[in-house]
Amino acid sequence: MNQKKAVILLSGGLDSATVVAMAKADGYACYTMSFDYGQRHRAELQAAERVARQLGVIEHKVIGLDLNGMGGSALTDESIAVPESPSEGIPVTYVPARNTVFLSLALGWAEVLDARDIFIGVNAVDYSGYPDCRPEFVEAFERMANLATKAGVEGNGFRIQAPLQYLSKAQIIQAGVARGVDYGLTVSCYQADEQGRACGKCDSCRLRADGFAAAGISDPTPYF
């Protein structure tokens, strides 16, 4: 019997690393995809490669995209500062249509691989309020995927799996530790330095630190 395959979006951060471990524990042959899209630092891409090796994925791809030219986000436009305190509404670290673009490319690879499952580490509990992390988005993308692909119209539909959707950050960390994730390999900070050290001030750093504290697990994050 052939092992079921999954394409997994792997940013190099805590959430996506956990998703890879979950998929592997569920018996999937894991194919991971990361994006060099003009983000502020490459440390997360290096982290993604480390995580892919540690968790033993079948293949890890890094896709080049230039989102700098569009701007519109503190993660792709150096002229927009990364906020270091909570704000109302959708934060400036939101990258326009990022998850839509990333999932579309993962969908293409999944169709080539004859993989029926695509995993993404979005979360609607301890998150920054991005519209493309909501359950409604995941459900809508799955419907689109099955309308827009050869596999979908031939009855071999895709599933967009978001296993972290309703978990707290502490629950995510506990799930990853139980499945052997080395969180010391991951980078979550929006403005990490070249060594992957975190600022400890941005929204992503706060969510990560609070999650480790709530989980009762030592935080391996290095700070500059």
Curated annotation (Swiss-Prot):
Pathway(s) this gene product operates in, as recorded in its UniProt entry: Purine metabolism; 7-cyano-7-deazaguanine biosynthesis
CDD domains the record matches: QueC-like (cd01995)
Keyword Metal-binding applies: yes
Residues engaged in binding Zn(2+): C189, C199, C202, C205
Disulfide bonds: none
Record protein name field: 7-cyano-7-deazaguanine synthase
Its biological purpose: Catalyzes the ATP-dependent conversion of 7-carboxy-7-deazaguanine (CDG) to 7-cyano-7-deazaguanine (preQ(0)).
GO BP terms in the entry: queuosine biosynthetic process
Catalytic activity field: 7-carboxy-7-deazaguanine + NH4(+) + ATP = 7-cyano-7-deazaguanine + ADP + phosphate + H2O + H(+)
InterPro entries: QueC (IPR018317), Rossmann-like_a/b/a_fold (IPR014729)
E.C. numbers: 6.3.4.20
Manner of cofactor binding, per the entry note: Binds 1 zinc ion per subunit.
